[in-house]
């Protein structure tokens, strides 16, 4: 520290303009060095936007989803989201994605959402973290696309994945400040590099990741990612009640009219699994639109009010959406949408024919 204090201001400023040099200085003399800049290193100081409150941290899956969405350029958004959820279930680098998401959240809170575009940030951070490029992701991770009965799914061969990942170069930053330093050293946010590094160092909330090719979810943190939820006797009692009988628990919570038959008639399905990564290739029926429940469905509706569609084609539904065929309202909704689409097509062809004539 004495040597630093005796260094000329110009020489010191030149040295500290290097993010790597500044990080080394902070690691050595941070506790003595930072108080000089106390007014600048507050977590949400002059760099912040007009709304200086910290926003919700970016979810690791959302970072993954944004980076690999380009895998399905010609796929409908809802289908692409389903595919990416399945790929996420077999991704071995969730700890690295958590690290990337934390650094993005930090920069967004410091500089504002405008200057820190997520897609642009991932284009910088992911190569620095040696994430698998989208163009080779499916092949490297051992995924194979199948389409039984027209339903596209992915199957993963973990042996192929491990062999492929073992051949890849896997040196990467292992803490938040390491990744931030690498980003700043690459020439991004240079006008704010010093104060950004000092603020992150002062926060002391870095995530440690392992360098294993298949590190999985192993994330060691200097402090918890999320604050723990306090446990109360009431919570413990209710959780135990749900474990013993979820129907009785709902009955006690909502009232006597909410019994097993009530929930059963509403086509609300649930699955209990030990690990979400093993919950794959399951078609989950979505909830009905907010309207009268199926138990109140009017089965005596006049025939002229029903959709005039000749038949219900199951294979038409596969690429459209997932519906519950035990729900009368869901069937009618699908048939009505099909009828409307057919009418629009007829109008279009009539319009074209009239122009041709």
Curated annotation (Swiss-Prot):
* Any one GO BP annotation for this protein: positive regulation of mating-type specific transcription, DNA-templated
Q: What cystine linkages occur within this chain?
A: none
| One Pfam assignment | MATalpha_HMGbox
Where is the major localization of this protein?
nucleus
The keyword Amino-acid biosynthesis appears for this protein:
no
The Swiss-Prot or TrEMBL record marks DNA binding at: 53-108
**Which Gene Ontology terms cover its molecular function?**
DNA binding, bending
Localization, UniProt: Nucleus
Task: Decide whether keyword Hydrolase is in the record.
Answer: no
Task: Look up the record and report any one GO term of the cellular component aspect.
Answer: nucleus
**Keywords assigned:** DNA-binding, Nucleus, Transcription, Transcription regulation
Q: According to its UniProt record, which protein family does this protein belong to? A: Belongs to the MATALPHA1 family.
Q: What does this protein do?
A: Mating type proteins are sequence specific DNA-binding proteins that act as master switches in fungal differentiation by controlling gene expression in a cell type-specific fashion. Transcriptional activator that induces the transcription of alpha-specific genes.
What is the name attached to this protein's record? Answer: Mating-type protein MAT-1
Source organism = Fusarium oxysporum (Fusarium vascular wilt)
What would be the name of the gene that encodes this protein? MAT1
